[in-house]
Amino acid sequence: IKTNKFNHLINDKLKGFDKKLSLKTNDIFLKLKLNNNSININIDNPKIYSGSEFIDLSKIDINLDLIKFIKNDNSIKNIQIISKENPIKTLTNFINSYKFNASRFVIFNQIESGNIQAKTNIYFDEENQNDFTYEVTGKVNNAKLNTLNETFVSNINFNFDIKNQIFNFDNINLRYDNIDFQSKKIRISKSGKNFEVKGDLSNKKGLIKPNTFSK
């Protein structure tokens, strides 16, 4: 079923999370699944806004509990958000507009170029919709960084999986100081106030300057 009935519901949920956020949608499709008492809402090609900054999305799928929806209770089971391939600068501008952080702003300013695509799954607690878990997977292509000492890291490509404060990166390739580096996998996990990093790093044959990792 094609409908616009849920436009306000979705935007109200977003604004309940943060008033800065809004969603621009075209057509919304509704699928009723009586076999498991659920409603699926499918939104194609929406845009999510924070002020004037926005991210292009490929689709949003929302799974609702039918009975709870009829009773006007907490009805959202899970949400899947799939983005289009966006410039990384578009994403960082969106994040800065949504919630500015000076330290993060300095880091973001080091990003010269590159593209990112991601899929986010959000699973809501049945009793309290303010409690949820999430998983973000995706890939970064052809990114380039300009570090504070004017040294460039280029040709950055990797896949990522973020879940429960654990960051997994795989198939990593990058070029630094005219040397190509690769990593099969790097895992970063939070341990108290610190982060623990595990993984591998290798390089193709090339001359490594003594100060490459101490600049």
Residue spans for each PLM region:
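Outer-membrane beta-barrel translocator domains and adjoining extracellular loop/strand segments
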Residues: N149-T151
